C-alpha cells in the first residue's frame, strides 16, 4: 500500500436526538449529531415513530415558495 494517501481515522462520539451516545471511528474529527439511531429507529424497536419533516418542508416553502408562485402565474 502507498503511504500518506489514506485519511486519518479518529475516535468520535455520535449523539442521537433520543440521547443515546456511542463511539465509533471516522475520518471526521468533531462529534456527530444524528436524528435516528438503532436505539430509536422503528425497524429495530418495533414501534412506529413519525419523523418530523414538516420543518424542512416549511423551510423550503419559505425559501422558494414565492419563486414557484411566480413561475405558476406566468
UniProtKB/Swiss-Prot annotation:
Annotated cofactor note: Binds 1 zinc ion per subunit.
Record function comment: Binds the 23S rRNA.
GO CC field: ribonucleoprotein complex; ribosome
One of the GO biological process terms: translation
Gene Ontology molecular function terms on file: metal ion binding; rRNA binding; structural constituent of ribosome
Superkingdom of the source species: Bacteria
Family, similarity comment: Belongs to the bacterial ribosomal protein bL31 family. Type A subfamily.
Protein name (Swiss-Prot/TrEMBL): Large ribosomal subunit protein bL31
Gene transcribed to yield this protein: rpmE
Amino acid at each position: 500500500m502507498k503511504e500518506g494517501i489514506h485519511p486519518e481515522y479518529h475516535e468520535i462520539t455520535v449523539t442521537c436526538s433520543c440521547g443515546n451516545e456511542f463511539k465509533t471511528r471516522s475520518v471526521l474529527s468533531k462529534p456527530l449529531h444524528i436524528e435516528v439511531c438503532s436505539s430509536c429507529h422503528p425497524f429495530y424497536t418495533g414501534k412506529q415513530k413519525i419523523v418530523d419533516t414538516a420543518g424542512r418542508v416549511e423551510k423550503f416553502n419559505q425559501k422558494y415558495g414565492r419563486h414557484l408562485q411566480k413561475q405558476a402565474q406566468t
